[in-house]
Amino acid sequence: MKTPPEPRVAAPRVFASPDISIVGGASSLESDLAMLGSLLDQTLARQVSGAFLDTVERVRQAADEDLDTSIEELEKLDLATTSQLVRAFSMYFHLANVAEQTHRGRQGRGDRDEDRGPLNRVTELIEDALAAGELKRADVEEAVRQLDVRPVFTAHPTEAARRSVLIKLRAVSDLLDERVSARRVANEDRRWRRAAEMVEELWLTDELRLEKPEVLDEARNALYFVDGLMRRPVTDVLLHLVDCLAAIGIELPVRARPLTFGSWIGGDRDGNPFVTPQVTTSVVDMSLDHSIRTMFLLFARLIDEISVSERHSEISKELDASLQKDLEVITNLDPRYRRLNYEEPYRLKLTCVRAKLESTLLRMQRRSRHQPGVDYHSSDELLDDLMLMYDSLMANGAEIIAHGTLEQSIRTVAAFGLTLTTLDVREHAEAHHAALGPLLDRVGQFDRPYLSLSREGRVELLSEEVASPRPLGLFPTALDGRDLTTFQTFESIRGLLNHFGPNACESYIISMTKGADDVLAAVVLAREAGLVELRSGVARIGFVPLFETIEELRRAGEITDQLLSVPSYRRLVALRGDVQEVMLGYSDSNKDAGIAASQWAIHRAER
């Protein structure tokens, strides 16, 4: 039976605005910490009791002054009070982290605005090196063209924060940012009342769910962050990169993709039986839905802004032909747009783009076939439409308009594509051998089981299989259980690529790679699923060995050399742009040898 709580010391609506005069300027970290601490104190007094707030303060002071005193103070508390105390300090640290992150972001933006950011410093170094003859401009331009940074989202088991909590912490961060530019005291009071509301909601919200989140829950949490990036921050970073490069006379092509995003959520099958092929498809469906709905907002703004009339500016022949074709094949276009925007070709084209996105979303929901010209199969098709407008504006004297919101939207679409992130799929090396065993044994070409072959024997056999156009047989009759699921994962990848285009999934990661045969086994399964056909020049995904243990990290170069010396595999790499991706180290590296040894092994492998 629960003990009744002590009477609360204040009515729920009682709120006292923190006094910023005692903690410095509005933008200081100390000010933010003090104000958030004050709001938390008020919440504890209202929602628990004044006596509890006194206890929190005594424990805090004891921890600052003397460890023994702190222990004595804690030993006096009952379990319920101790639990509340842990929550109180945890929440303070959450709020402190938010304040620090917001402060760092504020500093970064300030540095960028004053040309003191990291990109500014790098471009200054490049400019000095060019002037000194240490770098050639052609080499820098080529490096810019090849620039490819891809942060990857993953759902680590230790990341258990609920989206409800994340949203409230984000709101607190936004309020801290807004406070910097606040001018009126009334607005300041209103802002801190809103912050008090968020803090109180955080206190009354379960920090963790009682049930373990499912894969789709993890995906929703990740999409919360990606949505926020797509709405503005990534565009700002890309435009800053454009400005920095322009300062040294180098142009970043408008549809270049120097920054994209990847995700393991929904694709990381290693050790997680809940990541089924069906779940993988559902996660990508969800990502596409989020991406297109955010694009609706981007293009609504473009439609409002780009009201260029043919009465005042011509359009390119290419844009005119594309627009006429759109008007012929798009049946879900409201007739009034044809009438109202008849002499505003950019608005009309953007309205057609929006109609195609609506059809793309509908196609995904219905699992229907792609209709060229009616919906988009890939982000490249969407970018083609946007570039037609950009090129037309540039060719007809409207460069300022082209370089405005339209260019920003093109760079945003290039970064995120139709599915926001590119999915990486990962599976343990042994799973591929286990699935191949019964299939190869059934062929009957060998005098002993496939799984009993040495690594050298497997490499020889699998090298021939990768090059062979002969299928191993009908899988449903040969596989069951986990082996069937392993193969179906490759089938689901084929479905994703067919449905969402080549950017939906690009890399298949083989964890615990210990030899070239581990990668070749995955390639053979991919060939059976129609993802690889060397004689036809088909290599729809790349294969990434993941070296994790200390021994494999030491042998990473040797194993990679052996893999690339296999003619059939070398042909596959050539079809993928002559780039072999390798992944070094993961959490299992630390488990295998400890943090210091594993980091040193990774460092040596990278060199």
Q: What spans do the regions from the language model cover?
A:
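A general structural signal for short secondary-structure junctions and capping/turn motifs
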Residues: R255-R257, I265-G266, R411, N498-F500, ...
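Generic non-transmembrane alpha-helix signal with a bias for helix starts/N-cap capping motifs
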Residues: L406, A605-E606
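Short glycine-rich or small-residue beta-strand-to-loop segments that form or flank ligand, phosphate
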Residues: S90, Y390-S392, S507-S511, F543-L546
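Interdomain boundary/hinge elements
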Residues: S536-F543
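Active-site cores of enzymes that catalyze phosphoryl transfer or operate on phosphate-rich substrates
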Residues: V329, C352, S359, T422-L423, ...
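Often metal-dependent polyanion-binding catalytic scaffolds in large enzymes
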Residues: M1-S463, D480-R482
